Amino acid sequence: DENVFPMKHKKEWDGDKLFDSLYEALRTFLLANAIRDIRDVEKNTHRSMLINMSRFTKVQSVIMDIVQSHVDEVKRNVKQTHKFPKAYALTNPIIKDLKKTFDKQFSSFQYSLDGVTWDEVFAQLYDAISKIKIVVVNSGKNSSKLNYDDNKDGLRVIAVGGLALSRGLTLEGLMTSYFYRNTSTFDVLMQMGRWFGYREGYDDLCRIWLTKTSYSYYKYIYKSTEALTSDIRTMGLEKRNP
């Protein structure tokens, strides 16, 4: 429902809730952290989530506050229930939603060689998410700098931003991307496309939320890039110059 947060919103937007799909994306990122803690030998790795919904710095701060409130609520409920009997914990609506997200996004892992079950994830979840930070990254005075090098124990962060995230900024260990923006500008799309690269060792945990319009643009770019690559390869075989 675009009425919750219009695509063409104004800089004065000051709502108090966002899309259900964003909350689903947030739960996915939290769960992915727990899964990596279970699977990875190296625990001190950087893990990031990207949220790009507005070009207005004021609106980005509002979004950050909403995300902070939601994540704090999840942390609080996980802390209160993670030592309860599993069936009883699932009577908590927050935990029930986490289980639904796990079943939707990651349940197939239970049947893989390094299978991870819900019980394992829930037991690990609080430790995995307790140090996740939510920051806003933009040109404003309240912006945070993502100093990954200063966090030797691994920075776990949800970054909310706009243009700064679209052009040039690298998010280490990016696993979850939520992108509610439409742009048809080729170079901007290509720059943002690097978010979605192959992530060795955790590519199966990466998830992307896009609008249908953005998806169609990326599909077009993919086909164009593949055609160009094929043409260059053919010209090389024929000893021709581009």
Give the location of each predicted region:
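Flexible loop/turn segments at secondary-structure boundaries
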Residues: 57-60, 141-146, 166-167, 184-188, ...
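Short His-Asn-centered micro-motif
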Residues: 52-54, 137-138, 157-163, 179-182, ...
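Generic, well-ordered alpha-helical scaffold segments in large soluble proteins
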Residues: 25-32, 36, 66-77, 101, ...
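Short, well-ordered loop/turn elements at secondary-structure boundaries
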Residues: 25, 43-46, 128-131, 151-156, ...
